[in-house]
């Protein structure tokens, strides 16, 4: 009499399932480990602070940081005052989005040189200009709000936050 083969097939399926789980666990473990290592190596927690030196963890921002130190806003504003929304949720959502985009671009060496501001970041900067300087520009704002070709503050005042770039 022959031995039934059903238990052997069940054992084989269990073994394959266990190996697949071990393999998946290893892949997830390596991915998480690499993410934690990269976050630590890039001093990721510093990006959650208001310290402007966090912006120069990445060498590509050194020129902007140096310009800010010598610029007119150094005594009054940090990077976050201009580059992230004021509300808590918007602030950290923007920091996460910027951190992801910057780390991806830095890792893949996919930065435009010199670094350029994105349209969404330009809107945040403009809104923060208005938040601090609204009383001085109220007539301009009310006029440009009706204009289909509204002008962002930094289109004319491009050197205010980071100082003059070489050659300007």
What do these predicted regions represent?
Residues 2-168:
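Short sequence/structural segments immediately N-terminal
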């Amino acid at each position: 009499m022959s031995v039934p083969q059903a238990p052997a097939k069940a054992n084989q399926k269990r073994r394959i399932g266990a190996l697949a789980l071990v393999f998946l666990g290893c892949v997830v473990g390596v991915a998480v480990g690499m993410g934690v290592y990269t976050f630590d190596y890039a001093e990721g927690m510093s990006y959650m602070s208001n310290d402007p030196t966090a912006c120069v963890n990445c060498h590509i921002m050194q020129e902007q940081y140096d310009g800010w130190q010598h610029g007119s806003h150094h005594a009054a504003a940090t990077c976050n005052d201009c580059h992230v929304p004021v509300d808590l949720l918007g602030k950290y959502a923007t920091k996460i989005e910027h951190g992801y985009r910057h780390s991806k671009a830095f890792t893949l060496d996919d930065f435009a040189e010199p670094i350029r501001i994105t349209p969404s970041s330009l809107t945040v900067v403009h809104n923060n200009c208005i938040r601090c300087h609204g009383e001085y520009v109220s007539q301009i704002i009310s006029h440009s709000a009706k204009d289909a070709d509204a002008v962002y503050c930094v289109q004319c005042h491009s050197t205010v936050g980071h100082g003059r770039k070489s050659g300007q």
